[in-house]
Regions:
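Enzymes that bind and transform nitrogen-containing heteroaromatic metabolites
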Residues: 4-223
């Protein structure tokens, strides 16, 4: 069974430490989410099994994650290549508290690099020794600035519907990467609710066809 060396690609990101400095111009802020064809990223109970199913059973290429809580995905070759390119580009992650809680803090170290969590209250037991998870309570602009600085010229990946919406509304997103899963949920948590200043105009997409998933990458045209 073929294996992609995903864990080797993320080791450099795991060694990255938070360093607040002038942000390199090359840093991009990229929304990254799996979504059903009808626009939901989770069901009404926060379940994500259907939209993440392509990670686990869409092919025979093994993709190993890094971080403190490693996983092994089984995807098609096009999806493995897509993940390789994406992870190679990322230097930090920005999420909301809901995503942090669902992921149980990624074991203290996110596979894609330092993680910045938007929250009103730091959870009990955090921050932890040797963890690269940082908490931000002074707004989306500050969170993006800190994540860009930690990314050291690489891109910042944004997870979570609410955090992505905040970035869009603040004009901070450069690209939207959507993995369209081959499923209709009918109800649940929508990715693109509560948008201000619509329409948000996107550029022409790059499309990669996997098995059970279509990977779309749109540039966001700045207002």
């Amino acid at each position: 069974m073929p294996v992609r060396p995903f864990d080797q690609m993320v080791k450099a990101n795991e060694r990255t430490t938070m360093k607040i400095s002038n942000q390199p111009a090359a840093s991009k802020v990229i929304a990254i989410m799996s979504m059903s064809l009808d626009g939901y990223v989770a069901d009404l109970n926060d379940g994500v099994a259907e939209v993440f199913d392509w990670y686990m059973s869409s092919g025979d290429v093994e993709v190993h994650t890094g971080g403190s809580d490693p996983m092994t995905f089984h995807v098609s070759q096009p999806s493995a290549d897509h993940l390789h390119d994406l992870v190679s580009e990322l230097g930090a992650v920005l999420t909301g508290r809901r995503t942090f809680d669902k992921a149980e803090g990624w074991g203290g170290n996110h596979a894609w690099g330092p993680a910045f969590v938007l929250t009103h209250h730091i959870p009990d037991g955090w921050p932890r020794p040797n963890s690269t998870v940082h908490f931000v309570s002074d707004g989306i602009e500050s969170a993006v600035d800190q994540a860009k600085a930690a990314a050291a010229g690489k891109s910042v990946g944004v997870h979570g519907a609410d955090t992505i919406q905040q970035c869009l509304n603040a004009g901070l997103l450069d690209e939207i990467h959507i993995d369209i899963a081959a499923v209709l949920l009918g109800s649940g948590i929508r990715l693109f609710d509560h948008l201000a200043g619509t329409p948000v105009v996107l550029g022409n997409p790059t499309t990669i066809q996997g098995i059970g998933v279509t990977h779309l990458r749109y540039p966001v045209r700045k207002r």
